[in-house]
């Protein structure tokens, strides 16, 4: 599978749940499946990074269930998803095409990751709204979205092993 397809998919995950994408990427980097050493994104592989992103992802999963949580489409939420999708996409594509020296591969991965985040944000909101209408409440739809995001991120990370 192309690194750009993986970058797009991790961007979609960021659109669904902003912190799951960098958590997955940081675990891949920490496990040595994503060679980011010596690149500007090497921090993804630092010892504490996967734990920090995982804690943030769990907090996001919990707070998403709260009724006072703002829409993912408000500028701050939307912007964060785009930035995290871009960073995650750059890490995936750049690790396999060389990020050192500002490689175009990492830049293209960032763009593709950002596009994926927009797709995931808008598409995820639409699907969740439809599911919530079908179930008559939001909680089951949110849980389905959580599972889809986690499983997709895990599949993306596993597909990078031995890439």
Write out the residue ranges for each language-model feature.
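C-terminal ends of transmembrane helices
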Residues: 58-74, 122-134
């Amino acid at each position: 599978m192309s690194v750009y397809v993986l970058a797009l998919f991790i961007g979609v995950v960021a659109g669904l749940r902003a912190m799951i994408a960098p958590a997955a990427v940081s675990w891949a980097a920490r496990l040595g499946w994503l060679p980011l050493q010596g690149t500007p994104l090497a921090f993804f592989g630092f010892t504490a990074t996967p734990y920090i992103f995982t804690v943030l992802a769990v907090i996001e999963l919990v707070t998403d269930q709260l009724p006072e949580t703002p829409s993912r489409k408000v500028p701050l939420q939307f912007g964060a998803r785009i930035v995290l999708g871009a960073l995650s996409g750059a890490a995936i594509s750049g690790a396999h095409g060389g990020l050192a020296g500002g490689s175009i591969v990492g830049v293209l991965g960032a763009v593709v990751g950002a596009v994926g985040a927009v797709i995931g944000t808008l598409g995820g909101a639409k699907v969740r709204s439809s599911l919530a209408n079908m179930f008559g409440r939001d909680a089951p739809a949110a849980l389905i979205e959580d599972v889809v995001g986690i499983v997709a991120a895990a599949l993306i990370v596993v597909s990078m092993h031995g890439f």
